[in-house]
């Protein structure tokens, strides 16, 4: 799982 696109990039 990863944070929304903007806060972080994964």
From Swiss-Prot:
Lineage, top ranks: Bacteria, Bacillati, Bacillota, Bacilli, Bacillales
Native source species: Bacillus cereus
Name this protein carries in UniProt: 92 kDa protein
Further facts: Under acid-stress, this protein is expressed at a higher level in wild-type B.cereus than in the acid-sensitive mutant strain NB1.
């Amino acid at each position: 799982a990863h944070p929304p696109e903007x806060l972080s990039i994964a």
